[in-house]
Swiss-Prot record:
Name under which the protein is recorded: NAD(P)H-quinone oxidoreductase subunit 1, chloroplastic
Assigned GO CC terms: chloroplast thylakoid membrane
Protein EC: 7.1.1.-
Organism listed in the record: Ranunculus macranthus (Large buttercup)
Subcellular location: Plastid, Chloroplast thylakoid membrane
Any one GO MF annotation of this record: quinone binding
Amino acid sequence: MIIDTTKLQAINSFYRSESLKEVYGLVWLLIPIFILVLGIVIGVLVIVWLERQISAGVQQRIGPEYAGPLGILQALADGTKLLFKEDLLPSRGDIYLFSIGPSIAVIAILLSYLVIPFGYHLVLADLSIGVFLWIAISSIAPIGLLMSGYGSNNKYSFLGGLRAAAQSISYEIPLTPCVLSISLLSNSSSTVDIVEAQAKYGFWGWNLWRQPIGFTVFFISSLAECERLPFDLPEAEEELVAGYQTEYSGIKFGLFYVASYLNLLVSSLFVTVLYLGGWNLSIPHILIPELFGINEMGGVFGMTIGIFITLAKAYLFLFISITTRWTLPRMRMDQLLNLGWKFLLPISLGNLLLTTSFQLFSL
C-alpha cells in the first residue's frame, strides 16, 4: 500500500495550524482578563490608600507613612498580615455556608467588571443588556452576606446578614428605574452605546445634566448598596460588633474588605459610564476625544488616554464617597428603610415617567 506523503503532510500541517489557532485564541482571551484582574487589584490598593490619607486629612492626623513611600504599600502589608493569620471556624456554626459566603460576595462583584467599558471597545463583554446584567449580578452579593451571617451561629452576625439583605433590596429597586431612564435616553442598554450616546452632544450631553434627579437617586442608592456611611447598618460597630464579619478572621475577613472596595469601585465606574460620559472628556470648544483621536485611534496611546479619563472620573466620585463617610452620621434602620421606600422609590419612578413622556413627545 502506497501512502501519499504529500497529502499526509498537508493534513498534519492543517491540524497543527488549527490547534495553534485555538491556542492563540485562548491566549488572547486570557490576556485581557489577566490585565483586568491586575488593574482591579491595583485599583483596590489605591482606593485603600486614598481612603486612609483622606480620612487622616479630615481628622487632622497623620495617616500611614511607614509601609512604602507615603504609606502607599500599607494595604499590601495589611493583606499579607491577614493572609498568615489563623483561620478560625465557629464550633456550632454551619461551616459550609460560613466558608463560601465571602467567596460568593467577591465573585458576584468581580463579574460586574465584565460589562464596564474602560475605553473605545475596551470591554470584555459588550452585551445588549449590559446595565441590567450588572443589576442582576449585584443582587447575588447580599446572598453571600446572609449565608455568612447565618452560618456563623451568632446573633450579631445573623442580624448583620438580615440587615444587608434588607438594605440591598430597599435600594436596588430605586436604582433600577434610574438605569431604565438612561436606557430610554440612549435607546440602548449596552454600556458602550450609552457612552457613545452621550458623546454626540459633547460636555452638555452628559446624562448628569439631562438626568439630575436620576443622578442624585443613583448616587444615594449606590452608596447604600456599598454599605458605606451613613448606610453601614449591616456592620454597625456600636450595635452589632462587626455584623456578619464578627466571627471571621484571616483571609476570609480580608475578603469582605476586598468585596467592599471592589463594590465601591464598580459603583464609581458605573456612575462614570452612565452619567459622566465614560472615556469621553468633552470640554466646551475642546473635544478631547477628537484631539487625541480616542474614538478613531486603535493604538495603545488612544486606549491609555481613554482608561485614564475613565479612572479620573471614577476616582473623583470615590473622593466624594470617602468624604461623605466622615461628614454624615449613621442612620437608624427605620430611617434607612423609609428613605429607600418612601422617598427614593417614588422619586425614581416619577423621574422614569417624566423621561418616558419626553421621549414619546420628541418622536
